[in-house]
Amino acid sequence: MNYSEKLTGAPPMTEVPLELLEEMLWFFRVEDATPWNCSMFVLAALVAIISFILLGRNIQANRNQKKLPPEKQTPEVLYLAEGGNKDDKNLTSLTETLLSEKPTLAQGEMEAKCSDVPRVHLPDPQEPES
């Protein structure tokens, strides 16, 4: 007679069916957890090894990428880059030209022309007053 037979042998006074007792015995079984613990340890070790391998490959790939010379640009990319530089040069020269020119009308004169008020000639701010 083994351990499970001792536990499933229901006394005559209990009304719990034998099948329910066997199911409860299986559900609440107490066994040695060594196989489960060993399998979890092996799986954890396997995950750690794979992680270190992937980490090492990633580090090596980054090092190799830094060692490679920069990629040669295609003529189309060079043409676009030159075109952008030309546009920037034209834009900067245009802004320099516009900023260096003296504005023809002062703000006050501009407002006076727009309104119906008689013109008032404002003195040029750069002329010295005497």
UniProtKB/Swiss-Prot annotation:
What are the annotated GO cellular component locations? basolateral plasma membrane; membrane; plasma membrane; protein-containing complex
Q: On the Cytoplasmic side, which residues?
A: 57-130
Q: Where is this region: Disordered?
A: 99-130
Q: Where does this protein chiefly localize?
A: membrane
* Pfam families (UniProt xref): OSTbeta
The entry's keywords: Cell membrane, Lipid transport, Membrane, Transmembrane, Transmembrane helix, Transport
Where can this protein be found? Cell membrane
Give residue spans, biased composition: Basic and acidic residues. 110-124
Can you name one GO molecular function term for this protein?
bile acid transmembrane transporter activity
Give the top-rank taxon of the lineage listed in the UniProt record for this protein: Eukaryota
Does the keyword Magnesium feature in the UniProt annotation? no
Positions of transmembrane segments: 36-56
Which chemical reaction does it catalyze?
taurocholate(out) = taurocholate(in); estrone 3-sulfate(out) = estrone 3-sulfate(in); dehydroepiandrosterone 3-sulfate(out) = dehydroepiandrosterone 3-sulfate(in); tauroursodeoxycholate(out) = tauroursodeoxycholate(in)
Provide one Gene Ontology biological process annotation: regulation of protein stability
Residues in the Extracellular compartment per record: 1-35
The UniProt entry lists membrane topology as:
Single-pass type I membrane protein
Q: What does this protein do?
A: Essential component of the Ost-alpha/Ost-beta complex, a heterodimer that acts as the intestinal basolateral transporter responsible for bile acid export from enterocytes into portal blood. The Ost-alpha/Ost-beta complex efficiently transports the major species of bile acids (taurocholate). Taurine conjugates are transported more efficiently across the basolateral membrane than glycine-conjugated bile acids. Can also transport steroids such as estrone 3-sulfate and dehydroepiandrosterone 3-sulfate, therefore playing a role in the enterohepatic circulation of sterols.
Q: What is known of its domains?
A: The transmembrane domain (TM) is the major site of interaction with SLC51A. The extracellular-membrane interface is absolutely required for transport activity. The intracellular-membrane interface is necessary for establishing the correct membrane orientation that is essential for the heterodimer Ost-alpha/Ost-beta complex formation and transport activity at the cell membrane surface.
The annotated subunit structure for this chain is:
Interacts with SLC51A. The Ost-alpha/Ost-beta complex is a heterodimer composed of alpha (SLC51A) and beta (SLC51B) subunit; induces the transport of SLC51A from the endoplasmic reticulum to the plasma membrane.
* Family named by the database record: Belongs to the OST-beta family.
What is the name listed in the Swiss-Prot or TrEMBL entry for this protein? Organic solute transporter subunit beta
**Protein species of origin:** Bos taurus (Bovine)
